[in-house]
Structures are given as structure tokens and as C-alpha cells.
A protein has these predicted regions:
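A conserved SF2-helicase RecA2
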Residues: 636-645, 649-718
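Interdomain linker/hinge connecting the two RecA-like lobes of the SF2 helicase core
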Residues: 414, 447-450, 456-459, 465-558, ...
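Conserved P-loop NTPase motor "coupling/switch" region that bridges the ATPase
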Residues: 329-334, 349, 353-359, 376-377, ...
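Small-residue hinge/turn detector
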Residues: 71, 101-105
Length: 718
């Protein structure tokens, strides 16, 4: 027999509990209204942006263009009456133009039609360009409302995380408690309804006393405080820190201005329709994917064995990580990433940063224990082509995904690393090969790689080797090969993409580094040349990564600038590159000769490299023809790097600028980078970024301390 509980609360108590939960729900609805309001503001500002940009273009088209097709339009009469451009004509009606003596109503209509067509075509080609160096009222309005939208969206997400816990039970309790809102309702309710109301009151009181309401109120308080502090400058500053987040939000609201309205990205529609139905969860991914990246993940998951050939800078690594997260959420446990040794550390760091799956390095002295750890626990084994011979996998083990980065490394079918990698691939039903190289330029290489993924398609395209850019060829390889260019998917083209390239030192580099640390005194200049100070740069992990970046840049029609603080480093690099490199720029080169070197570099073909001391070539020179910047070691003052990057990243630059900072893990590079990052974060909390760059540096005393700490670490390691 169930004991009935006695009602120990008043009707006013019940109404109070209901009121508290109703207020929380009311606030949630208000936040949704705020979100909708900010979206409307963004749409309104974007329309103004589109209008102004369109008028700017039309103002540059002289009225003489009306007669390009020899239509008999008397453009001199238009100029006489003050109509000098298409914009002037757009502002007035057909009736106004027809009042000009010598222009009939029919010609006036023709003039307006020509301008209207030009206006429509112009609008279709305009995309939103958010540039910190060229702020307009419209772009500032867009940035401000996007920042506010992000804030309220984050608020709603945080509240929902709390609100969704036991939400159905709570909703039912709130319905049941309404029985106790007043005397007459209680009087005419059944005994069962009264019992449910009593139990519901106790449950809801328990929820409130557990901090449910306080947690939500604290989140709301923090969000309101942030909302009140969001100024134009704050919003722009946040945009520079995380443009991907802003553009991802805008892509959902104004896709026509971001270039996100086209989900096909060059694939046949039959494949697209299937891919778009792919359903998966990205819980555990710690970043926002752009729409084209989400589509890439769909493609990888649906097609199962693919070669992703996106251009450098589009985030192939992020798409691979997101795919592994999606598969982990479907129950997969073991993943493998095979990559060149030069990017192994980078892969481990990216995985740690962007997802909650554990990366396990299977390389170097700990490769055996790392391999066993991965077998036992699962996660993402990150290894090199050379180490794949170690992977003797049990027949029963199936990997969720094998990722092969820089897949052109296995283009030689007779090489050991090719056969070892192919053997690994037999343990997975899903394969992702990645390369930034345009394989259309080397069909034999493409066929060999595709043959591993899909022999049937490889056999089909053998007969099409002479037509790599023909529609039939593209349609044939579409199920297995997918390549997008930046201009295809990033209409806003983020102008500066910065990458930290972490390199793992080999034995000779480590020996040289320890030798430098062991010397008496504070020889920090010698220590800072880590990896570059080996006798032969073929033993340098930084040089190896540098050569890979240069090759990728050449494939994409780019030129490269390399900066180092040290003359010895740039001399070694120049010798290594040979004819690919211009004459070096250092402090002894006269300004006139510097310009002559740069002029020669400007007119050179893709793949050309300019090597310069950062203090000599880092200021006062314009080198817009280069769009890849490599910095050989971290500088002790961020402004030095900023000024160097600005040689290429400036007005007149027509391409994204890709910046690569070459760094060695577990060395002075890591210590300097960490300290500068901390100082920058502290300084940015109280000052603007330009001021921070000029005022932050590591002084000689700090360098001395870093060296002593490195020496202590070396002794402990040995």
C-alpha cells in the first residue's frame, strides 16, 4: 500500500515555485528574440554594404560604356546633363532621362535596362570583405551585431546544457504542480492529482535548492556584463582573434555574401544529394567548422575511401579530425594518422587542441611503448611513413579511419613505405588520403593513389590521361577525389593565415642543441639557432619542413619570403636552395641593391624564394608578389615578426598570406613562444593589439633564465 504524502506547502508556495521556473523560461524566450534581432540587424547592415559596394563599382563605369554595343545612345548628352557614370544613371528614372532633349523614351528605357543589368551582375559578384584595416560603418555594424549574436548564442547554449538535464521530468512536474495553484483548483482535483502535485513540489524544490536557478542566473549575469562591454573596437578585436567563428555565423545568415550558398563545390549533383543526407554527431570537437568543411566531412564519411586534395590553408587537418570525432561518436575506437616526420608534432598538437580524442605518438625512442599503448587504449596513433613497418596489427583489429597525410609520399609503388602504408590500409574500411598538391598535373601519380582507394575508378581514368580537366574525367573521379580552391569556398578569403609548424628534432640536431647548452656563458644566439646550426641542413627538421612548404607554394603558383634573425642561417638556406633563391638581403646590402633584388623577385615565376635577415628585409620594403612567409625562429619581440609579415601582407596583396613559424618542440623555441603568448594575453587585457606588439619583448635577463632552465631540463633528461 502506497503511503500518501501530506501537503506541507501553501498555494502561494506552489505559485512561487511555478513563477521561478516560468521566469527562467521567459528569459530563454527573450534571448531567442535577441538572437533574432541581431540576425535582422546583420541582414540590414549587409544590404547597406551590398548597396554601397554596388554603387562604388557603378561609379567607376563611365557612361561611354552604354554605347559599347553601338546602340546609338547619345552619351555626350548624358555627360552634358551631369550623368558621368552608371551610378548617376541608376539614381534617376526613365522619365527623368527621357526629358533630355535628343533622348527618346525608348532610348531612356534602353539606358536604364543596360544599367540595371550591369547592377544585377555586379551584385552577384560582390562578397563581404571584412578587413580590420578598412572598416566601414556597414562592416562595423555587421561585426558588432555578430559579436552580440555570438554572445547570446553562447548564453543560450550554456543555459540549455543545464536546462536539458531531466527536462521532461521537470516539465511533467510543472504541469502536475498547477493543481496546487489555488484553493478551488485543489478542491476539485482528484486524490491522484493532489498526490502528484505534492511529489512534484518536493522535486522542484529539490531542483531549486541544488543550485539550478543560481547556475543559470550566474551565466546570465556574466553574459549581460559582456554584452554591456561590447564596443566596436572590442568586436573587431574579437574578430581578428577568431575570424572563422564570425564567418561561420555569417555564412548561416547571409550565405549569398559569404559564398556559402553553394553546397555543391564542383561535385555532380547525384553525389551531392547522397552526401547531404549523412547524419553524425561532432560532440567532442572543439572548433567551429565552416560550411565547406562540414561538407568535406560529409563527403569523407559517405564515400568511405577518398583522396582530399583541398588547397593549403583550407583546413584538411581539421576535416580529418572532425571525421575521426564523428566516427568515435559512432563507436569506433582506433584511428591512425600516417604523416611525414616534419609534421608529426603538428598533428599531435592539432588533435589535442581541436578534439577530445587522445593522440598517441608512435615514433622515436618511445615508438614501441606508444604502439602498445594505442593497441590497449585506442585513440589516434600518429606515426611516420618510416615507422609504419612497426605496425603489426592483429587480424581482428579494425581501425575506424586511416589518414594518410601528404599522400604523394607513397606514389612509388615499389617503395617500402608505400607497401607498409597499403598494408595498414587493409585494416580499415575507411581511408582518407590528403594532399595539397594539384594531382591533375600528374595523372600517373593520381592513378596510383586512387588505385589504393578504388581500383575500378583508377582503371577507368587510365584511358583519360590526356584529358585531366575535362568534365567527364572530373565526373569519373568525383566519388573518390575532391579538391577545392580557396576562391571556390572562401569568398571573403581570410587575408592572413598563421601556422605554428612544430618540428621534431633528429639525433644530430638534439646533439648540437645539447652541445650549445653545455657551453659556458650565456650564448643564447647560438642556442636560438636550433636545428639550423647542424653542419648539414639535410639533417635539419626545420629545413625539411621549409622545403615541403616551398614545394607546396610552387604548386599553387606562390612565391616565398624566408626571414631569419641570423646571417649564418640565411646563408645556409641560400646555399641549400641554390638557383631557386634570389640573392640574400642582409644589413650590408644597400637600399638601391635591395630594391633591385626585390624587382627581380617580383618578376620571377612561382616557387621563387627571397631570403632575408629579418632586421634588414623586415621593414621598409613592399613585396606583395609573395604570399607565403616563413619565419625560421621565434623573435624575442612580436613587432619584429609583425613588421616582417607586413612586407607581404599589405595593400595591393591579391592573395591570402600564409605565415609559417618553424619551431622545435622541447627547446628554447617552445619556451620563447609560451612566454610571449602569456605576455601578449596579459597585455591585450589592458591595451590594444598594436600597442602590445610594440611593447612586448623578452629581455636579456629573461633569456638568461630560459637558458638556465633549459640546461636544468637537459640534465634531468640525461
Amino acid at each position: 500500500m502506497i503511503m500518501k504524502q501530506e501537503k506541507k506547502f501553501s498555494f502561494a508556495d506552489a505559485r512561487n515555485v511555478l513563477s521561478q521556473f516560468n521566469q527562467i523560461e521567459k528569459n530563454r524566450n527573450q534571448y531567442q528574440k535577441k538572437s533574432n534581432k541581431y540576425k535582422k540587424n546583420i541582414v540590414k547592415a549587409s544590404k547597406n554594404y551590398l548597396k554601397n559596394e554596388t554603387m562604388r563599382v557603378l561609379e567607376g563605369i563611365p557612361v561611354e560604356e552604354l554605347n559599347r554595343g553601338k546602340k546609338g545612345i547619345r552619351v555626350k548628352l548624358l555627360r552634358t546633363h551631369g550623368y558621368n557614370s552608371y551610378a548617376d544613371v541608376d539614381y534617376v528614372s526613365v522619365k527623368t532621362i527621357s526629358k533630355i532633349k535628343g533622348i527618346s523614351p525608348q532610348k531612356a528605357r534602353l539606358i536604364k535596362d543596360i544599367v540595371a543589368n550591369a547592377k544585377s551582375a555586379t551584385q552577384e559578384g560582390i562578397y563581404l570583405k571584412l578587413n580590420v584595416d578598412h572598416k566601414t560603418p556597414e562592416t562595423t555594424d555587421i561585426i558588432l551585431n555578430t559579436m552580440r549574436l555570438k554572445n547570446v548564442n553562447d548564453l543560450m547554449y550554456s543555459i540549455d546544457e543545464i536546462y536539458q538535464v531531466d527536462s521532461q521530468k521537470r516539465k511533467e512536474a510543472l504541469r502536475n504542480l498547477k493543481t496546487a495553484k489555488g484553493f478551488f483548483r485543489w478542491l476539485f482535483s482528484s486524490g491522484n492529482a493532489k498526490q502528484k502535485a505534492i511529489e512534484s513540489y518536493d522535486y522542484l524544490e529539490m531542483v531549486l535548492s541544488s543550485g539550478f536557478k543560481e547556475k543559470i542566473e550566474n551565466i546570465e549575469k556574466d553574459s549581460l556584463s559582456l554584452e554591456q562591454s561590447i564596443s566596436n573596437d572590442y568586436a573587431w578585436n574579437e574578430f581578428t582573434k577568431n575570424p572563422i567563428c564570425f564567418n561561420t555565423l555569417l555564412e548561416e545568415i547571409i550565405p549569398e555574401l559569404i559564398g556559402g550558398q553553394n553546397d555543391v563545390y564542383g561535385l555532380p549533383e547525384t553525389i551531392v544529394e547522397e552526401i547531404q543526407t549523412e547524419d553524425y554527431s561532432l560532440d567532442g570537437l572543439h572548433c567551429n567548422l565552416r560550411r565547406y568543411q562540414k561538407f568535406g566531412v560529409n563527403y569523407i564519411l559517405h564515400q568511405r575511401k577518398v583522396l582530399l586534395g583541398d588547397e593549403m590553408g583550407l583546413g584538411k587537418t581539421i576535416q580529418a579530425i572532425a571525421t575521426m570525432v564523428a566516427l568515435r561518436n559512432q563507436g569506433e575506437t582506433h584511428f591512425i594518422v600516417v604523416c611525414p616526420a616534419s609534421v608529426l608534432i603538428n598533428w599531435c598538437r592539432e588533435i589535442e587542441k581541436f578534439c577530445d580524442i587522445q593522440p598517441i605518438k608512435v615514433h622515436g625512442s618511445t615508438r614501441q611503448s606508444g604502439f602498445q599503448d594505442w593497441l590497449d587504449r585506442g585513440g589516434i596513433a600518429v606515426t611516420t611513413y618510416e615507422t609504419t613497418s612497426l605496425f603489426e596489427l592483429p587480424e581482428s583489429l579494425k581501425c575506424g579511419l586511416v589518414v594518410v597525410d601528404e599522400a604523394h609520399y607513397i606514389k612509388n609503388p615499389d617503395a617500402k613505405r608505400t607497401n607498409n602504408t597499403k598494408r595498414l590500409c587493409t585494416h580499415a574500411d575507411r581511408l582518407l588520403f590528403m594532399t595539397g598538391t594539384a594531382l591533375e598535373n600528374n595523372i600517373d601519380e593520381m592513378i596510383r593513389l586512387i588505385h589504393i582507394l578504388n581500383p575500378d575508378i583508377a582503371n577507368k581514368i587510365k584511358g583519360m590521361k590526356m584529358m585531366p580537366f575535362a568534365p567527364l574525367f572530373r565526373e569519373t573521379i568525383a566519388p573518390v577525389y575532391y579538391r577545392r580552391k580557396r576562391e571556390d569556398v572562401l569568398s571573403e578569403l581570410p587575408e592572413l593565415l598563421e601556422n605554428e609548424e612544430w618540428c621534431e628534432m633528429g639525433y644530430k640536431e638534439q646533439w648540437k642543441y645539447y652541445e650549445c647548452l653545455s657551453k659556458e656563458g650565456h650564448n643564447y644566439h647560438e642556442i636560438r639557432q636550433v636545428s639550423w646550426n647542424v653542419d648539414d641542413l639535410h639533417d635539419s627538421s626545420k629545413a625539411s619542413r621549409m622545403l615541403e612548404i616551398i614545394e607546396e607554394a610552387k604548386e599553387e603558383g606562390r612565391k616565398v619570403i624566408i626571414f631569419s634573425f641570423y646571417l649564418d642561417t640565411i646563408r645556409k638556406i641560400s646555399k641549400l636552395l641554390g638557383d631557386q633563391c634570389t640573392e640574400i638581403i642582409n644589413g650590408s646590402v644597400s637600399p638601391k641593391h635591395r630594391q633591385e633584388i626585390i624587382d627581380g623577385f617580383e618578376s620571377a615565376s612561382a616557387g621563387r624564394v627571397l631570403v632575408s635577415q629579418i632586421m634588414a628585409g623586415g621593414t621598409g620594403l613592399n613585396i606583395q608578389s609573395a604570399s607565403v612567409v616563413i619565419i625560421c625562429e621565434p623573435q624575442i619581440k612580436p613587432s619584429i615578426e609583425s613588421q616582417a609579415i607586413s612586407r607581404a601582407y599589405r595593400m595591393g596583396q591579391s592573395r591570402n598570406v600564409l605565415v609559417y613559424r618553424l619551431l622545435c618542440s622541447n627547446t628554447i623555441d617552445e619556451r620563447i613562444t609560451d612566454i610571449l603568448a602569456r605576455k601578449t594575453n596579459v597585455f591585450n587585457a589592458f591595451a590594444d593589439q598594436s600597442a602590445a606588439a610594440d611593447n612586448i619583448e623578452i629581455d636579456s635577463a629573461s633569456l638568461t633564465q630560459i637558458i638556465e632552465e633549459e640546461r636544468s631540463r637537459m640534465k634531468r633528461a640525461s
